[in-house]
A protein has these predicted regions:
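A structural motif corresponding to the C-terminal end of an alpha-helix
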Residues: 69-77, 131-145, 176-190
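Well-ordered, non-membrane alpha-helical segments in soluble/globular domains
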Residues: 56-67, 125-134, 168-180
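N-terminal substrate-binding region of glycoside hydrolase catalytic domains
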Residues: 2-123
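Active-site groove signature of glycoside hydrolases
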Residues: 106-124, 131-167
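Short catalytic/ligand-binding loop motif for oxyanion handling, primarily in non-cytosolic enzymes
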Residues: 51-52, 87-94, 154-160, 198-201
Length: 221
C-alpha cells in the first residue's frame, strides 16, 4: 500500500480555521507606506505626550481614527499597542505640561540618547494613574484591540533602563502600573516584556518578545 502526500491550501475565511489572534503582529513606523507581507494584526507604539497633550485632554479617538488613515492596506485589522514615556533616540514621550510642573528629566547617551523621567515623582505617578484609567475606559471594550502591552516604564516601555539601572522605576511604581492596568483592562489580555519581579507572579499576564525571531533575550540568533 502506498500513500501520496497532498498539500491542502486553505483560503482566508472567517471561522475557526483562522486561529484568531495568533501569529505575528507587524510593526508600523511613520516612514512606512505599506506592509511588505499580508497581515491581519498590527502593532503600534504611541507616546503618552501624543495621547494627552494637555491635562485630561485625551486624544484616544483621534489616534484610533488614524490607524486606517495611515495604513489603508490594513484597514480593520486587530491591533496591539504600547504607550511609552521614553523611546531612546526619539523625542520624549512625557507630556510637556508634566515636565513644566517640575518632573525631572534625566539625560542618558545609551541607544542614541534621550531623557529618562523620574518615574517615582508623585506628580508623574498620579497623572499616569489617571491616564491609565482613562485609557482603559476608552479601549477596554473595543473588540478591535486584541492585546495591550504594559509599556510606560523604561526604555521603549520595556520595563528596563539597562545599563542605566539607576534610572528605572521603584518596585512601588512598578506595582502601581501593573495593578492599575489590570483594573483598567479587565476584558483584555495584557502583556509584559519580561517575567521579572512583580511581573512574574500573575497568571493572567502574558509576555511578548519584540525581536523574535531575529534574536532572543540571550542574544542567540
Amino acid at each position: 500500500m502506498t500513500t501520496r502526500q497532498q498539500t491542502k491550501r486553505l483560503p482566508p475565511a472567517l471561522g475557526p480555521l483562522d486561529n484568531p489572534l495568533k501569529g505575528w503582529a507587524a510593526y508600523w513606523f511613520s516612514w512606512l507606506t505599506h506592509y511588505y507581507q499580508p497581515v491581519s494584526m498590527n502593532f503600534w507604539y504611541v507616546s503618552w505626550r501624543e495621547l494627552e497633550p494637555n491635562p485630561q485632554d485625551y486624544q484616544f479617538a483621534q489616534w484610533a481614527q488614524s490607524w486606517d488613515k495611515t495604513q489603508p492596506d490594513t484597514r480593520e485589522n486587530h491591533g496591539v499597542f504600547r504607550v511609552y514615556l521614553d523611546y531612546p533616540s526619539q523625542p520624549t514621550g512625557v507630556p510637556q505640561w508634566l515636565i513644566d510642573q517640575g518632573v525631572e528629566m534625566r539625560p542618558y547617551s545609551d541607544y542614541g540618547g534621550g531623557l529618562s523621567p523620574d518615574y517615582d515623582d508623585p506628580r508623574l505617578v498620579q497623572a499616569l494613574t489617571r491616564f491609565i484609567q482613562a485609557l482603559g475606559a476608552y479601549f477596554n471594550n473595543r473588540p478591535r484591540v486584541a492585546f495591550v502591552q504594559l509599556g510606560f516604564l523604561g526604555f521603549w516601555g520595556e520595563w528596563h533602563t539597562w545599563p542605566r539601572t539607576e534610572l528605572f522605576a521603584s518596585d512601588a511604581t512598578q506595582r502601581t502600573v501593573v495593578d492599575e492596568m489590570r483594573a483598567a483592562f479587565p476584558n483584555k489580555i495584557l502583556q509584559a516584556r519580561t517575567a521579572n519581579g512583580y511581573l512574574g507572579v500573575h497568571p493572567w499576564l502574558g509576555y511578548h518578545d519584540d525581536m523574535f525571531p531575529e534574536d532572543t533575550d540571550g542574544g542567540e540568533a
